[in-house]
């Protein structure tokens, strides 16, 4: 089995369905004997360019270990799901389990927001 990193972008109006989508794709991988190494929900972020007249979208990253048939099934699911705007699959040399640089940035932004919310207004 090979290691893959999959990033997919979900329509911002469908953000509440993202946890269910993640569970569905995780279920496909595990049902076929694959392994989930990392799941990251990067949240709603600004896109580099407009897609379908949208400036923001919900980003999700999965690091998995599976065979080609499982990967094909996941990618077919992306193609027939109207909520998925784009997806990218990259073959990796080894399993990635540490937080990605993007996730570290998301955590840093969340920490800054919570710090600002706790600070009293002057």
Curated annotation (Swiss-Prot):
InterPro entries: Ribosomal_bS6, Ribosomal_bS6_sf, Ribosomal_S6_plastid/chlpt, Transl_elong_EF1B/ribsomal_bS6. Residues 97-122 are annotated as: Disordered. Residues 106-122 have a biased composition (Basic and acidic residues). It comes from the Bacteria. Pfam families: Ribosomal_S6. Keywords: Ribonucleoprotein, Ribosomal protein, RNA-binding, rRNA-binding. One of its GO terms (molecular function) is structural constituent of ribosome. Belongs to the bacterial ribosomal protein bS6 family. Binds together with bS18 to 16S ribosomal RNA. This is Small ribosomal subunit protein bS6. It comes from Janthinobacterium sp. (strain Marseille). The lineage of its organism: Bacteria, Pseudomonadati, Pseudomonadota, Betaproteobacteria, Burkholderiales.
């Amino acid at each position: 089995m090979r290691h893959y990193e999959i990033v997919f972008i979900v329509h911002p109006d469908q953000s509440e369905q993202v946890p269910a989508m993640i569970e569905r794709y995780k279920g496909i991988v595990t049902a076929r004997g694959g392994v989930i190494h990392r799941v990251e929900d990067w949240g709603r972020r600004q896109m580099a360019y407009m897609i379908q007249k949208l400036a923001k979208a919900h980003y999700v990253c999965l690091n998995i270990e599976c065979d080609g048939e499982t990967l094909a099934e996941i990618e077919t699911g992306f193609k027939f799901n109207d909520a998925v705007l784009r997806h990218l699959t990259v073959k990796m040399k080894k399993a990635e389990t540490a937080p990605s640089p993007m996730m570290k940035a998301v955590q840093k932004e969340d920490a800054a927001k919570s710090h600002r919310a706790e600070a009293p207004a002057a």
